[in-house]
Regions:
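Glycine-rich, basic loop-to-helix element that forms the pyrophosphate-binding segment
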Residues: 64-82
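Catalytic core of nucleotide-sugar-dependent glycosyltransferases
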Residues: 205-211, 217-245, 260-293
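Donor-binding/catalytic cores of nucleotide-activated saccharide
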Residues: 92-200, 206-224, 243
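A conserved acidic beta->alpha catalytic loop
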Residues: 30, 38-47, 66-68
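Short aromatic/hydrophobic "clamp" motif used to bind/position activated sugar donors
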Residues: 87
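Cell-envelope/extracellular polymer assembly enzymes that use nucleotide-activated donors
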Residues: 2-5, 23, 33, 186
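Short, well-formed alpha-helical segments that are part of the catalytic scaffolds
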Residues: 12-26
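Membrane-interface aromatic/basic loop that binds lipid-linked glycans or pyrophosphate carriers
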Residues: 269-343
């Protein structure tokens, strides 16, 4: 068997940490090391890690005592310690199916791929599943095939960390950016640029828990800076694959970043007044040169409310989303609560 290193940053995750660790210990593939990296937690997370490390020698507790904190720099500590042939990243508030490692490693060995991707189930904190995201396309892709149908690859392959198993020798020289958000996208972009073959499993093994108000869904002062760094990595990947002459391949990530900024700015958790929200969005627009891509996105790929939002952006009416976003959020949340009470 070939060892896999599972890297899990831990920060104030005591409510969900046991479930995450237990889901790893239940794996049908036993040759792994679970690296728990405590990032200065102020709750009981560290003690939970200590207790599990005493019970199972495959579990190692590491500490991020550096001046740089956050998920990126914390994962880098795990990468420096990892000894596995394969690398897998997992968050401390999620959980995985028992067969994840077995299926992903079998696929990687059978296909000789550099990266194996699998599906994700989206879960609410109430225990209700809200859907899943699984690959819909050719199961094995060479780099040249990604070039031929880049937009399909981009739309169908979300840039998460935790729906991918990496071959260690492929990503050995890649490190995480020390940014508050988007470090996972940056790493995924750099890893994809190194991969010659990507294999897909159509089953969903990872359970992502959506936590209202969590750091990745919350506006912070560095959000625009993080999106700018993310854009740099995305452009580097696309340029290495397709060059710079055609702006169309860049339109997908450009819209992804711009819409993500709009989503965070229009959330009820964003404290900025309307004028400041527009100013922040203008910063991102200038960083990315967004107007170059505004009208060339293939809008027929989007449907329903999302398409409406994309069309508003196309015609420079994103201020409407910023203005009505908080109201929309409250209405949707109220409807969701009513539906849950009926169940």
């Amino acid at each position: 068997m070939s060892k896999v290193s599972i890297i899990m940053p831990v920060y104030n995750a005591e409510k969900y940490l046991c479930e995450a660790i237990e889901s790893v210990l239940k794996q049908t593939y036993a040759d792994f090391e679970l690296l728990l990296i405590n990032d200065m937690s102020t709750d009981n997370s560290k003690q939970i890690c200590i207790e599990y490390a005493k019970r199972d020698r495959r579990i190692v507790l590491l500490e991020n005592n550096s001046e740089s904190h956050g998920p990126g720099s914390t994962r880098n500590i795990g990468l420096d310690y990892a000894t596995g042939v394969y690398i897998y990243f997992m968050d401390a508030d999620d959980w995985i199916d028992d067969c994840l490692l077995q299926c992903a490693i079998h696929c990687m060995q059978e296909t000789e791929a550099d990266i194996v991707e699998f599906g994700v189930v989206y879960e609410l904190d109430t225990g209700q599943s809200t859907g899943k995201c699984c690959w819909d396309g050719k199961l094995i892709l060479q780099k040249d095939e990604i070039k031929k149908d880049f937009f399909h690859f981009w739309k169908e392959s979300p840039l998460y960390l935790w729906n991918r198993l990496f071959r260690r020798k492929t990503v050995k020289n890649i490190k995480f950016e020390s940014i508050f958000n988007g470090e996972d996208v940056c790493y995924s972009m750099d890893a994809l640029s190194k991969a010659e073959k990507i294999a897909h499993i159509t089953d969903a093994f990872y359970h992502y828990r959506y936590l209202e108000g969590s750091s990745c869904h919350r506006w912070v002062e560095s959000t625009i800076e993080c999106l700018g760094v993310q854009w740099t990595h995305q452009c580097r990947f696309i340029s290495s694959l397709l060059g710079d002459a055609d702006p169309l391949p860049y339109a997908g990530p450009a819209y992804d970043n711009y819409m993500w900024a709009i989503y965070q700015l229009s959330s009820i958790f964003c404290p900025l007044p309307f004028r400041e929200k527009r100013r922040e969005l203008l910063k991102l627009k200038e960083i990315m040169g967004f107007d170059r891509y505004r009208g060339i996105y293939p809008f027929e790929l989007e449907h329903g409310l999302l398409r409406v939002k994309f069309m508003l952006v196309k015609y420079r009416l994103e201020w409407i989303i910023l203005l009505l976003g908080p109201l929309y959020y409250r209405v949707v949340k109220r409807m969701r609560n009513i539906a849950q009470r009926k169940e």
